[in-house]
Design a protein with these regions (language model features):
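A conserved ligand/cofactor-binding region detector
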Residues: 1-6, 10, 23, 35-36, ...
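Periodic, rod-like helical contexts
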Residues: 16-18, 26-31, 38-39
């Protein structure tokens, strides 16, 4: 089985080479030699050791993206086959400057020098539709069918980035989708003098992979975010289904070969999109398609705030994804029938558990869709998962008690200890060996040295040295003297 991780945020930083070298155990004194060799080979942005780039990860791809990067590193190290899917954004969130004590955001052109670790795969591009209309018909066997006729299309071109495991021969893959136009230039519009119209489709399609987190304070911004979400989940699902087709595996066996993790609600449109493909394209029955869908997906929730749980307006979904809205309505109708059967007469419970918020501004609760369409739901910690069951999804926990579990998120020690603090990592290895790099639970053996004065002295020396380095950097970049005793 292949683990598949859907994550809209950017998931790897520009210091990918440094991460890779850390996995290969290239030590700090040798990094400067590697840096010179990389620059000689023309590797863009290869700055290592003391010249290592100092960029805030959150300003580039978001916390969820950083978490996804840790998962991919861990999966590769555990030698578990996995693919991480996302969007190949042309711009990050922003580059941060501090002027007169205030944050100033400037365009983050992180791809301006190219990215040597990615491999374009244009022969594996996918077509994605938006808007349009639906029409119903009867197939050759007299079954009721629906056909979606989009009026807008984009092409998703995959770019693959290798993710190497630590001290193993496993290489997993990050596949990022770049948006291209199906028609890049309209000669007719150009010839009649409509120069903007001649490239309108190209600009509109390529906007899908321009920037992470477009401003959703406007109708156009919200529409772009929705289209981004559908774009990358549609491309990713098509890619998975294509891999089965190439091996002659029937779509009914999809969950036996792909386990899809929804990292928060941003990829939840994958549920109606997979249903659409299975029903409308592969022509499965609803029951077979739904059992396949639920067996495929698992959902990780990242927030306990009800107001922060993602919702999309029905009006917007109807304009951008009309067929998907129909499928969501059908999922909701069938689900509420089950709730009604188990809790007859409890109208308030039906209202609370419905996927659709009724009223003047009707909307779809994406978190409810994720819970109903997945076979497993977890929070990011033991406490978080318990609060989900007792508060946020209490009704769903009563209805699907076997569906909720506590699976704690974590970080990779290779990135956040061995690479981030090499002197401390070396000190730990000196006393307990290097097994902790693959098994973080081995750090517990440090408790045996809790009263070891020699280790305590060396530990404090490492901390002091790191403070000196930070104070020097602040002085070099900002001209501000800082006492290390204040850190």
């Amino acid at each position: 089985m292949m683990i598949e991780y859907l994550q809209r945020d950017g998931v790897l930083a520009r210091d990918h080479l440094v991460d890779d070298l850390a996995r290969r155990d290239v030590e700090e004194p040798r990094l400067s030699l590697v840096r010179r060799g990389a620059l000689a080979l023309g590797v863009a942005g290869a700055k290592l050791a003391e010249d290592r780039p100092h960029h805030a990860g959150a300003a580039r791809g978001g916390g969820l993206g950083r978490l996804a990067a840790c998962f991919l590193d861990s999966l590769a190290t555990l030698q578990i086959p996995a693919v991480g899917y996302g969007i190949r954004y042309e711009f990050g969130i922003f580059d941060q400057l501090i002027r007169d004590g205030w944050q100033v955001e400037i365009t983050d052109k992180w791809l301006k020098g190219g990215w040597p670790w990615e491999i374009p795969q244009p022969d594996q591009a996918c077509f994605v539709g938006f808007g349009g209309r639906t029409e119903s018909y009867r197939d050759d066997k007299g079954n009721y069918r629906v056909r979606w006729i989009p009026d807008e299309h984009a092409i998703g071109v995959p770019h693959d980035v290798p993710v190497l495991g630590y001290r193993v021969n496993t290489c997993d893959r990050l596949r990022l989708w770049r948006a291209d136009a199906s028609e890049s230039f309209d000669f007719y519009a150009f010839n009649i003098g409509d120069y903007y119209g001649a490239v309108e489709e190209k600009v509109g399609s390529e906007t899908l992979s321009k920037v992470l987190y477009p401003n959703d304070g406007t109708d156009e911004g919200r529409r772009l975010r929705l289209k981004q979400q559908h774009f990358f989940v549609s491309c990713s699902l098509q890619d998975m289904l294509r891999s089965l087709d190439q091996r002659g595996i029937p779509v009914q066996e999809f969950p036996d070969h792909w386990a899809v993790q929804l990292n928060d609600t941003h990829p939840t449109l994958a549920i109606p999109e997979l249903m659409r493909i299975l029903i409308d394209v592969e022509q499965l029955t609803w029951e077979d398609a739904w059992s396949t869908c639920v067996a495929t997906f698992a959902y990780t929730n990242h927030t306990l705030l009800p107001e922060a749980l993602e919702q999309w307006s029905v009006e917007l979904l109807e304009r951008v994804l009309p067929r998907h809205l129909q499928i969501i309505y059908e999922i909701n109708s069938r689900f509420l029938q089950q709730v009604k059967h188990q809790h007859p007469g409890d109208i308030d419970r039906l209202r609370r558990m419905s996927l659709v918020v009724e009223g003047d501004n009707r909307s779809v609760r994406m978190s409810h869709l994720a819970v109903v369409g997945s076979h497993a739901v977890n929070g990011v910690s033991q406490l978080h998962s318990e609060l989900l069951r007792r508060q946020v999804f209490r009704d769903f926990d009563e209805f699907f008690p076997e569906r909720f579990c506590a699976t704690t998120n974590g970080i990779t020690p290779r990135r956040w200890l061995k690479l981030a603090n090499p002197r401390l990592a070396d000190l730990i290895t000196e006393y307990i060996g290097d097994g902790w790099i693959r098994d973080l639970s081995q750090l517990e053996s440090l408790a045996n040295y809790a009263h070891n004065e020699e280790l305590a002295s060396k530990w404090q020396a490492v901390k002091r040295n790191n403070k000196l380095r930070l104070a020097k950097r602040i002085h070099d970049e900002q001209g501000i003297e800082i006492s290390i005793d204040s850190l």
